[in-house]
Structure formats: C-alpha cells, structure tokens
Amino acid sequence: FFTKAYSILDLIVKIAFELENPIESFSSITKLKSSEKIWGNRKQLRMNGTQDTIFEDCIVIKQIEALRNEAVHNGTWEFAPKVFLRIEDSTIIERYMLFPDFEEGHLATVKNRRHFFSSGTKVNDALIPIHEEFYRRLLTTLQNIVKYNANVE
C-alpha cells in the first residue's frame, strides 16, 4: 500500500504541474514539463499547502513517506518480521504484525535506530485509518485540481 500510495503522490504532482503550466504551442511534440517532477517537487505547485489535500503538511502523508522510504531503501520496516498469534483454548484467534512507532509522522528514532514497536499497535488497526485519510485527501485534492482548472480559461 505505502509504495503505491507514494507513486500516486508522484502522479498527482505531475498532473497538477501540467495543469498549472499548460502547453502553449502544439506545433511540435515536446517533452512534458512534468516528466522530471516527483513528490519532492510539490513545493513548486501553487496548490502546495492547500488544506485537506495531500499537499497539506499532515501526519498521514508523512507516515506514507516514511514507510515507503523504509521499505524501498531498507527492504522492510522490521529487520526480522514477526507474526504474533493470539490463542484461546488452543485455537488461533488472531494473527497480526505490529506497526512501527511514530513521532509526528516520522518513525520513532533513538540514536540512528528506527525499529520500535512499543505502542503495540497492530498493522490492521493502523492501516485502515491511514488508508481512509489518504483517499479522503486524494479525493479533495482532485476536486481542487478540477475546480481550479475549470476556472482558468
């Protein structure tokens, strides 16, 4: 989810950048202005910082960035992934993994160590609110892009 969500952030930056900087001449085929733009270039957009969008500084987007970067650059958010079992009367009731600890959207860190699970938050309990908030912000972002560009002519 986190890698795909981050890719969506990249794509939205490209779309917003193209719409904010439209092609003025179609006499030749030119490279898209957004071809080199990625999520890190969002600060160049007029929409950057817009409330309730993916461009607003918020914990959910920071968590997506942090977990995507951790997975891409370090392979996982836990060095030795563990699945925990809850057993009652010799029957497995639940299987779960723990979600890493965060401080203001960033992985909790102590002296270059980032893999802490002291909060005991289960992945399934954390993933649903992150997913819902991300898509709510994404929808608001797209609505703002459409509304802004409908008025630009």
What do the PLM-derived regions correspond to, one by one?
Residues 14-153:
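Acidic, Ser/Thr/Gly/Pro-rich intrinsically disordered interaction regions
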